[in-house]
Structure formats: C-alpha cells, structure tokens
Amino acid sequence: MRLTVVGANGRMGRELITAIRQRKDVELCAVLVRKNSPFVGKDASVLIGSDSLGIRITDDPENAFSSTEGIVDFSHPQASLLYADYAAQKKLVHIIGTTGFSKTEEEKIAEFAKYTTIVKSGNMSLGINLLANLVKKAAKALEADDFDIEIYEMHHANKVDAPSGTALLLGQAAAEGRNVMLQDVRINERNGYTGKREKGSIGFSCSRGGTVIGEHSVIFAGSHERIVLSHTAQERSIFANGALKAASWAKNHANGLYSMLDVLGLNDQF
C-alpha cells in the first residue's frame, strides 16, 4: 500500500518514515511538510539520516497525494481537517493520530468519513487500546458508589494539548463502562477550595516535563483498596507501527469513521 506521511519533519513523521522502511505491507510514496519548510526539495533521507530514499520532500498537498493510496497524519487539528477533505475528495484512506480536536472539528471529520475510510485514535498502540478494553470492563464491574475513577497522564515538555488524547480515550472507555456521557462527569482540574468529590465523576490530572513519551494510569479508588491500570510508552515506534497496521486494515474496509479498537478487533469484546 502506497502511503504519504504528512508533518514528515515532526517526531512522529520521522518515526513513520523509519517504520515504513521496515515493513513489507506498506511503501513510502511521498512526504509532506509545512509551506516553505527548509526541507522542501531535499531527499526524504535527510529526515531520518539514512541512505537516499529517492523521494523529494514537498510542501504541495496536490503533489503529495497524486499517486498515494493513504495519508498517515500526526499533525495538528487544522491541518488534519484539510487532509481529511483531500482524502474524502480523492477516496484515500486517512489515518489520524492527531489530538486536540474541538467538538466542531470532530463533527467535520465524521462528515468526511462518509466519503472515505478514516481511522482516528488518540493512541495507536496495541497496549493502550488493550488498556482501554480493561478500563471499560473494570468501570462496568466497579460501581460509582463504591469506586472513584481518576486518570493521570504525563508527557514531554513540548506537548501542547491537555488532557492528552490518550487520557480522553481512557476516560471515554470508563464512561462507556458506566453507561454515562464523559462530558457530563468529567472533572478537568482541581484548584483551591473544590468541595467534596462528586460521586460518579471522572477526574483528570496532567503533568508535563522532560522527554517523557507517555505515561497513563487509570485509578479505581474504593474503601480500603485501590486498583491501578497503567501503561508506559518507551518508544514512539509503537505508535508508528500501530498507525501503519491501521492503514493496511483500512484499505479493505468500507467508508466510515473507525478507531484502533476496530482495527484490533477489540470493539466486539466490550
């Protein structure tokens, strides 16, 4: 499957290029960077320090998408919406690992998915999606009157959105387990005099610092006992390989908006 990597000079863009070279089910077709990037016109090998790849870096989406079958996208919300539009028009698979979308932007992506196959997830790793599966089951088994749910995450100093897309994915799994809407029970932060904790609420707390790739814990706190389900990402390659697995899967599926739970066959297990 021929793929275009967008945001190719970012952390995940470089990881994706490296991962594609190591797989047989996908091949690198084009790499796209922001307008007037100093990388434009150079061989894509400069991004990963390898031998020549024979692919010139471009800042022109039309050029980047002209002969591709899919777009792999870890960029930012505004750019992802633009690429989703291209994908819908050209019937290209679109894999979205971007986070930080507003409700309106989420709705636009769902609309584009009527015309092409989109896989969108706050985290593309197998481990996190298995964790979400476990969180949903635990939330269903542990009643709100007996167990409080808190979600903690830490990322590197340069991450710009909070809570992370992964934390929200885990919060959504917990809310679904308890048959409630996350927006109705979500507590984003606590500061000053907050009063007692509301029964059934799902709290989020975030830390930023250093080069932490990603740490997430979901805490079920009851009387005299505490259950902690957690995941630590040690390399970004887990996200890249998950995204490429999603691309290969999406190629053979109908138009629609899917998640990594669909790709991994975990939705049926909830």
From Swiss-Prot:
Family according to the record: Belongs to the DapB family.
Pathway recorded for this protein: Amino-acid biosynthesis; L-lysine biosynthesis via DAP pathway; (S)-tetrahydrodipicolinate from L-aspartate: step 4/4
Protein residues bound to NADP(+): R34
EC identifiers of the protein: 1.17.1.8
Gene3D superfamilies according to UniProt: Dihydrodipicolinate Reductase, domain 2, NAD(P)-binding Rossmann-like Domain
Name of the featured protein: 4-hydroxy-tetrahydrodipicolinate reductase
CDD domains reported in the protein's UniProt record: DHDPR_N
Catalysed reactions, semicolon-separated: (S)-2,3,4,5-tetrahydrodipicolinate + NAD(+) + H2O = (2S,4S)-4-hydroxy-2,3,4,5-tetrahydrodipicolinate + NADH + H(+); (S)-2,3,4,5-tetrahydrodipicolinate + NADP(+) + H2O = (2S,4S)-4-hydroxy-2,3,4,5-tetrahydrodipicolinate + NADPH + H(+)
Active site per database record: H155, K159
GO biological process: diaminopimelate biosynthetic process; lysine biosynthetic process via diaminopimelate
Binding site for (S)-2,3,4,5-tetrahydrodipicolinate: H156, G165, T166
Protein residues bound to NAD(+): G7, A8, N9, G10, R11, M12, G97, T98, T99, S121, G122, N123, M124
Coiled-coil ranges (or none): none
Subcellular localization(s) per the UniProt record: Cytoplasm
Gene Ontology MF: a single term: NADP binding
Organism superkingdom: Bacteria
UniProt xrefs under SUPFAM superfamilies: Glyceraldehyde-3-phosphate dehydrogenase-like, C-terminal domain, NAD(P)-binding Rossmann-fold domains
Described purpose of this protein according to its UniProt entry: Catalyzes the conversion of 4-hydroxy-tetrahydrodipicolinate (HTPA) to tetrahydrodipicolinate.
Organism per entry: Bartonella tribocorum (strain CIP 105476 / IBS 506)
Gene symbol of the encoding locus: dapB
Cellular compartments per GO CC: cytosol
Alphabetical keyword list: Amino-acid biosynthesis, Cytoplasm, Diaminopimelate biosynthesis, Lysine biosynthesis, NAD, NADP, Oxidoreductase
InterPro entries (alphabetical): DapB_C (IPR022663), DapB_N (IPR000846), DapB_N_CS (IPR022664), DHDPR_bac (IPR023940), NAD(P)-bd_dom_sf (IPR036291)
